[in-house]
Amino acid sequence: MFACAKLARTPALIRAGSRVAYRPISASVLSRPETRTGEGSTVFNGAQNGVCQLIRREFQTSVISRDIDTAAKFIGAGAATVGVAGSGAGIGTVFGSLIIGYARNPSLKQQLFSYAILGFALSEAMGLFCLMVAFLILFAM
């Protein structure tokens, strides 16, 4: 956020020699001339508005900004993929409980098995949902 705007300048800004280019990018983007009142003449604000638009455009489409967006996509997709491991653990827990329940009371075999299938389906659905969100983050944004 405190990256100096002079590192991300266009050739037009270099020729203009504007003092705005030496301010931090956050200050250049957030201090819009149209939001300030009573500060200088309208001619100066109009000229500075053009320079601020150039800086804002360069700030929004810079290589660093795209790299940050790509890194955020990969981090988000990785975090969403962790849910698939939770699904595997849930399936293991469900069938482990089925075996323990069957060992304790073999007469409830059919009812325990139907509950185990229901638990398996819910765990698998959550895992697939997490995987779908990861793919959406990667390829739809």
UniProtKB/Swiss-Prot annotation:
CDD domains: ATP-synt_Fo_c_ATP5G3
Keyword field: CF(0), Hydrogen ion transport, Ion transport, Lipid-binding, Membrane, Methylation, Mitochondrion, Transit peptide, Transmembrane, Transmembrane helix, Transport
Positions of post-translational N6,N6,N6-trimethyllysine modification: 109
GO terms, molecular function: lipid binding; proton transmembrane transporter activity
Statement: the UniProt record of this protein carries the keyword Nucleus: no
Transit peptide: 1-66
Biological processes per GO annotation: proton motive force-driven ATP synthesis
PTM comment: Trimethylated by ATPSCKMT at Lys-109. Methylation is required for proper incorporation of the C subunit into the ATP synthase complex and mitochondrial respiration.
Entry's localization field: Mitochondrion membrane
Site (Reversibly protonated during proton transport): 124
Matching InterPro entries: ATP_synth_F0_csu, ATP_synth_F0_csu_DDCD_BS, ATP_synth_F0_csu_sf, ATPase_proteolipid_c-like_dom, F/V-ATP_Csub_sf
Any one Gene Ontology cellular component term annotated for this protein: proton-transporting two-sector ATPase complex, proton-transporting domain
Membrane topology recorded in Swiss-Prot or TrEMBL: Multi-pass membrane protein
Record-linked Gene3D superfamilies: F1F0 ATP synthase subunit C (1.20.20.10)
Anything else known: There are three genes which encode the mitochondrial ATP synthase proteolipid and they specify precursors with different import sequences but identical mature proteins.
PANTHER family: ATP SYNTHASE F(0) COMPLEX SUBUNIT C1, MITOCHONDRIAL (PTHR10031:SF56), ATP SYNTHASE LIPID-BINDING PROTEIN, MITOCHONDRIAL (PTHR10031)
Subunit structure, as described in the record: F-type ATPases have 2 components, CF(1) - the catalytic core - and CF(0) - the membrane proton channel. CF(1) has five subunits: alpha(3), beta(3), gamma(1), delta(1), epsilon(1). CF(0) has three main subunits: a, b and c. Interacts with TMEM70 and TMEM242.
Record: disease: This protein is the major protein stored in the storage bodies of animals or humans affected with ceroid lipofuscinosis (Batten disease).
Function summary: Mitochondrial membrane ATP synthase (F(1)F(0) ATP synthase or Complex V) produces ATP from ADP in the presence of a proton gradient across the membrane which is generated by electron transport complexes of the respiratory chain. F-type ATPases consist of two structural domains, F(1) - containing the extramembraneous catalytic core and F(0) - containing the membrane proton channel, linked together by a central stalk and a peripheral stalk. During catalysis, ATP synthesis in the catalytic domain of F(1) is coupled via a rotary mechanism of the central stalk subunits to proton translocation.
Protein name per UniProt: ATP synthase F(0) complex subunit C3, mitochondrial
Organism placement in taxonomy: Eukaryota, Metazoa, Chordata, Craniata, Vertebrata
